[in-house]
UniProtKB/Swiss-Prot annotation:
PANTHER family: AUTOPHAGY-RELATED PROTEIN 22. Residues 29-40 have a biased composition (Polar residues). Glycans are attached at residues 303, 662. InterPro entries: Atg22, Atg22-like, ATG22/LtaA_families, MFS_trans_sf. One of its GO terms (biological process) is amino acid transmembrane export from vacuole. This is Autophagy-related protein 22-2. Belongs to the ATG22 family. Residues 1-69, 257-279, 653-680 are annotated as: Disordered. It is found in: Vacuole membrane. It is a multi-pass membrane protein.
Length: 680
């Protein structure tokens, strides 16, 4: 069990070896209180007894009214993990499995065959719940060819298979616009926690409302899918912006000498709105140093917390750290992100298994699919409640608005600020070389992740003739592998002494094996074998395991690495850019695969495109330098804070609008000049 700091007076601290010239009761013996630094590449120390010591230098002092500088607690981390447990089931089970099938089936029951445009595609059948052997046999048999079906929406003929694709395209577009409209405002005021929770509850309710949707109102199902997918994306983007805050105020970052990567905040302090007192900080520092004399680091990568203080070393001796080791913040961020992804995958696995049982019980009926979506929405709703209770708001600095501003004008001000902030964020990202490189690689990588997944499912269904139960089993295997990957990649990278960038490169290399394996089917020797190169159904299962294992590593490492590169205080804006890059890229890959399929009449030629798409991010990631990116991000944050302060002071003193415009022009010019060296 991970030790926690006892109450003040409950333990006898380790008494350090006396230094030369000191006596046992010397008042000048020093107690180490590690300071919080930007990079934590060295553990600077300061004496409590030193006259220059200031409590505010040891604990982050509030930079604005309402800032929450309390240490990250176990309860707060649990709230962050809990939302992954709640919402990951929607994207894995809903978006990845049941919503596309449900939308297609709802449209099919209203469509006609493309061949004659008069014969109904499918007549409704009664619901007969059963667990008979024939039910399982029907699910495992390849589905017979039903023919292409079309429906008419607003006088336009649309293929039922394309109905779900168009629905998600619309939802992605709305999602991007919504994220832009409120992302900048999420960094200001007390809305950083409230907005994502509102989106979470609305999205979960929209998912549950699939239950009463019958084929006659299939367009309502499309509307619900758009609402739920839009709300999911918006809520996840905003909650991702909590990750740098949780890391920044984590005790192992504030007190790097500690050997236990857990919160030292007692249950009473978790509910206290005040920052820790000087007495508490001194007490926690003694406990941290006391632990460092007794035991090794708990559950930390070996190259991050190696060389803790020896048992008889003075407490003022700095901890030696290899120059090649990643920072404490990045190691912790990767660990939290990995745990969050893995916890979400475990929940998705449970709900996916539950959904398969429900579908089998109702013999793949329309009602069974809608019931599964109701369960997914209910799961999302219920487990979002602990997140709302445990995750602290940690509000950002408020916007400078007049005290009597109406709610409408306040909302309009936040809306306009968000769009302006995105434009500034894009400009800032252009000035940050490593952020720009990472986003370019992530654009291609995210597109390849979405395209490979959709292409594989379509290939398995149409070319290999796999049934819905077989496809669901592939999803289960991929989810299990994702859980394993999320927990394993951090330990593999530590064991092999890999940097985060090198770990991502390893994931990309393994990912490239999937399309290359599909291209083996073109070799005549492999064709004569009759297997390998995706010629048999069973070959999809190991590829699904590779896909999930790789995705578990990419999901956690990419998110945490990006959090290290962005400026502090602008997390929501930069994570909005991250999400827009993610969502926007997913439009191109599937469209190109569809065009290739239409041109050659089969999907296998699309593997050539996938091999190129997956491989392109590899050389780009080679140029990403985390240390350089962290330094440039910190420098940009300081410059932006300085310019913001100067501008606010000048705006107050300005007498007319023209002076303000001139000032804005000067501020932009100063920003460009300050970072001109980055473009040389």
């Amino acid at each position: 069990m991970v030790p926690r700091a006892p109450r003040i007076g409950d333990f006898e601290p380790y008494r350090p070896q006396l230094l030369r010239g000191q006596t046992d009761d010397s008042d000048t013996s020093k107690l180490s209180v590690p300071l919080s630094s930007q990079s934590n590449e060295a553990d600077d120390e300061q004496s409590l007894s030193d006259p220059s010591y200031d409590m505010e230098s040891s604990a982050d002092s509030p930079q604005y009214e309402g800032e929450d500088t309390r240490l990250t607690s176990n309860k707060e981390l649990s709230g962050f993990y809990m939302y992954g447990w709640a919402a990951e089931v929607f994207v894995v089970c809903g978006i990845g499995s049941f919503i596309p099938v449900t939308l297609e089936q709802l449209a099919r029951e209203n469509g006609v065959l493309l061949s004659d445009r008069t014969t109904p595609c499918k007549a409704p059948r009664p619901i007969t719940p059963s667990f008979s052997a024939s039910s399982f046999e029907a699910l495992l048999r390849p589905n017979p060819e039903k023919g292409q079906c079309v429906v008419h929406i607003l006088g336009i003929e649309i293929n039922t298979a394309s109905f779900a694709m168009y629905t998600f395209s619309i939802s992605v577009l709305i999602q991007a616009l919504l994220i832009i409209s409120m992302s900048g405002a999420a960094d200001h005021g007390e809305i950083q926690e409230n907005i994502p929770l509102v989106f979470a509850f609305v999205g979960s309710i929209a998912t549950m409302l699939f239950l009463p949707v019958v084929p006659k109102v299939y367009l309502l199902g499309a509307v619900l899918a758009i609402i739920s997918n839009t709300c999911f994306g918006a809520s996840f983007v905003l909650l991702n912006s909590f990750l740098p805050l949780l890391v920044r105020f984590h005790p192992t970052v504030r007190y790097p000498e500690s050997s236990a990567d857990t919160s030292y905040v007692s249950d009473e302090e978790e509910d206290d709105s005040q920052t820790p007192t000087q007495e508490r900080i001194e007490h926690e520092a003694r406990w941290a140093n006391h632990l460092s004399q007794r035991e090794a680091a708990l559950d930390e990568p070996a190259n991050v917390t190696t060389a803790l203080l020896p048992s008889r070393a003075p407490l003022t001796s700095p901890r030696v750290k290899p120059s090649t080791a990643p920072s404490q913040e990045l190691a912790l961020s990767t660990k939290i992100s990995s745990y969050g992804i893995a916890i979400g995958y475990i929940a998705a696995l449970l709900v996916q298994t539950m959904g398969i049982i429900v579908v089998i019980f109702f013999q793949s009926s329309n009602f069974g699919l809608r019931l599964v979506l109701f369960i997914i929405g209910l799961w999302w709703f219920i487990f979002t409640i602990p997140t709302a209770r445990w995750l602290r708001p940690r509000p950002g600095p408020p916007l400078h608005l007049a005290p009597q501003t109406s709610n409408f004008r306040t909302g309009l001000a936040y809306f306009s600020y968000s769009w302006k902030a995105l434009a500034r964020t894009a400009t800032h990202a252009r000035l940050l070389k490593d952020v720009l490189l990472f986003l370019t690689a992530w654009f291609l990588l995210s597109d390849s992740i979405a395209t490979v997944s959709g292409t594989a499912v379509l290939f398995a269904k149409t070319t290999l003739g796999m049934s819905y139960a077989m496809l669901a089993l592939i999803n289960v295997i991929a989810t299990l592998s994702g859980v394993l990957g999320a927990f394993t990649w951090s330990r593999l990278s530590s064991f092999c002494a890999l940097s985060p960038v090198q770990t991502i490169l390893c994931c990309i290399f393994l990912f490239e094996l999937i399309p290359l394996y599909g291209l083996l089917g073109y070799l005549p020797a492999v064709q004569r074998l009759g297997y390998l190169g995706l010629q048999q159904q069973w070959e999809m299962y190991p590829l699904g395991a590779v896909y999930g294992f790789v995705l578990g590593g990419l999901s956690s490492y990419c998110r945490s690495l990006y959090g290290e590169l962005i400026p502090r205080g602008y997390e929501a804006q930069f994570y909005a850019l991250y999400a827009i890059t993610d969502k926007g890229s997913s439009v191109f890959g599937p469209a190109i695969v569809g065009a290739i399929t239409d041109r050659w009449g089969e999907i296998r030629p699309a593997f050539w495109f996938l091999a190129v798409l997956v491989g392109l991010p590899f050389p780009i990631m080679l140029f990403v330098n985390v240390e350089r990116g962290r330094e440039e991000g910190a420098a940009l944050a300081r410059k932006l804070e300085e310019l913001s302060r100067l501008r606010d002071e000048a705006v107050v003193a300005a007498e007319d609008e023209g002076e303000d415009e001139n000032l804005s022009r000067d501020v932009r010019q100063g920003l460009e000049e300050s970072f001109s060296y980055q473009r040389s």
